[in-house]
């Protein structure tokens, strides 16, 4: 597959923001095959109008050398080519391949049970706390719903029109969020690594299996981690208000 595209200046799944570039839902994926035929659906502006099957990817990305890359897969090789860098990345059994890049990124990282957990940010006074929230969410969901299926998980601060967005092994977090909403969004988007990414669902026709289960999972997390200051009643009230 060969194609050329011009990115819009927009804070969305795919677009150029002031400090980062989002490449989400831009890469060709396998069309879902359901009930003996390929599944076709209209793109909706609300929700997550995608139905994605699993595949394995090897991606080569060439960017100006000043840019740091966060992606669905692990970087398996990195080469400097004069003023550019070439990254080779791979990911197995994922439903999509997404990338965020910026020349402003700093990276906080840790390791948990063989999983590399990374937090990419450019405007954050408490990056260690947000990295810890991602790790605690992974730990809780793994113990509650089953082991996290990948060996890397990245949370990325970026320009985005909503609170956040989920991709396999990669969560986008809006740079416009306050502290409380940032923590909530990290926990919420991390739950999507089970509900959509690991389990899979028809996000168009059965959206409750995506956002519904994710919101429920986040409520369970905060119920078991009261130090974050969220209650189930508060989360239900906020959801109903939307």
What feature does the model see in each segment?
Residues 3-9, 65-67, 145-149, 194-198, ...:
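A generic secondary-structure signal for well-formed alpha-helical elements
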Residues 8-11, 97, 163-167, 221-229, ...:
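Secretory-pathway/luminal and periplasmic proteins that interact with or process carbohydrate-rich
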């Amino acid at each position: 597959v060969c194609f050329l595209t011009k990115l819009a200046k927009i804070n969305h799944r795919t677009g150029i923001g002031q400090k980062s570039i989002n490449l989400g839902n831009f890469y060709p994926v396998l069309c879902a095959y359901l009930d003996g035929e390929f599944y076709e659906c209209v793109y909706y502006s609300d929700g997550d109008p995608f139905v994605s099957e699993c595949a394995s990817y090897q991606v080569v990305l060439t960017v100006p050398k000043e840019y740091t890359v966060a992606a669905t897969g692990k970087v398996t090789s990195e080469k400097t080519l004069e003023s550019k860098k070439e990254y080779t990345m791979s990911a197995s059994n994922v439903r999509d391949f997404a990338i965020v890049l910026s020349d402003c990124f700093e990276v906080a990282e840790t390791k948990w049970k063989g999983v590399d957990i990374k937090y990419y940010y450019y405007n954050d006074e408490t990056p260690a706390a947000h990295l810890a929230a991602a790790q605690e969410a992974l730990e809780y969901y793994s113990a509650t719903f089953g082991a996290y299926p990948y060996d890397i998980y990245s949370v990325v601060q970026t320009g985005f029109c909503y609170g956040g967005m989920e991709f396999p092994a990669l969560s986008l977090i809006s740079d416009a969020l306050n502290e409380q909403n940032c923590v909530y969004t990290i926990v919420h988007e991390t739950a999507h690594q089970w509900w959509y990414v690991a389990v899979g669902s028809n996000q168009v026709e059965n959206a409750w299996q995506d956002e519904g289960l994710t919101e429920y999972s986040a409520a369970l997390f905060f119920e078991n981690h009261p130090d974050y200051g969220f209650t189930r009643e508060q989360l239900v009230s906020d959801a109903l208000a939307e």
